């Protein structure tokens, strides 16, 4: 189309009255900022300027981050990719994100999601295989240089079915500034076995890249036998 969006597919039909193209099997959509989307079925509504699918689809950005969804709608005029349901992202650092709702601004390259679980890669985070570093949060907003989590909970404790982590760090807001390589917490509470121990109006520490590059140890707890 005139926006530079292209679709390739094995098979397609065109409804002239509704001005809708439907593709089948091995369909690939390429659009602005080198986003690429693959699906077995794509609907292109030229009147409403919406591209959509009710099938499992995979969205990949120019950096190699991979988004897997079970449905999507892409609003051409708003440059907005939206999905509800089972959503998974694997980023280039092998971190895994799970959402129930996701919206991606393909022009600004920003993302917002809800009901978020983030499983951080153990090796990149600098912890042993006995630890499971992770975040859960109500919402997440990701821009070029910052990641914002609202009502977030962080722990590195190993997952144990039916048991709460030995410790968690909970905060009203968690901000990761990739330029300053710092993680900020607002209204943070350290809990041990779900009991509040310390409260910090504000708290910050270097992100794991500082530890890897300089050997500087970030102030976080690891899983230990003393905490179960």
Language-model region placement:
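Structural signature for solvent-exposed beta-strand/loop edge elements and short helix-capping sites
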Residues: 1-228
């Amino acid at each position: 189309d005139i926006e530079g969006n292209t679709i390739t597919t094995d098979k397609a039909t065109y409804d002239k009255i509704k001005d809708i193209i439907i593709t089948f099997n091995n369909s690939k959509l390429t659009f602005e900022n080198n986003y690429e989307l693959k699906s077995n079925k794509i609907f292109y509504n030229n009147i409403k300027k919406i591209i959509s699918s009710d099938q499992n689809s995979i969205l990949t950005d120019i950096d190699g981050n991979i988004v897997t969804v079970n449905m999507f709608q892409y609003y051409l005029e708003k440059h907005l990719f939206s999905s509800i349901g089972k959503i998974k992202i694997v980023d280039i650092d092998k971190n895994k994100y799970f959402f129930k709702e996701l919206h991606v601004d393909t022009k600004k390259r920003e993302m917002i999601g809800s009901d978020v679980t983030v499983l951080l890669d153990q090796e990149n985070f600098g912890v042993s295989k006995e630890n499971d570093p992770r975040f859960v949060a109500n919402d997440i907003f990701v821009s070029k240089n910052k990641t914002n989590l609202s009502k977030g909970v962080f722990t590195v404790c190993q997952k144990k079915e039916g048991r709460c982590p030995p410790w968690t760090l909970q905060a009203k807001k968690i901000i990761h500034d990739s330029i300053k390589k710092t993680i900020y917490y607002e209204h943070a509470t350290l809990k041990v076995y779900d009991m509040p121990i310390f409260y910090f109006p504000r708290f910050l520490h270097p992100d794991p890249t500082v530890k890897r590059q300089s050997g500087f140890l970030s102030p976080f707890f690891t899983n230990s036998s003393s905490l179960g």
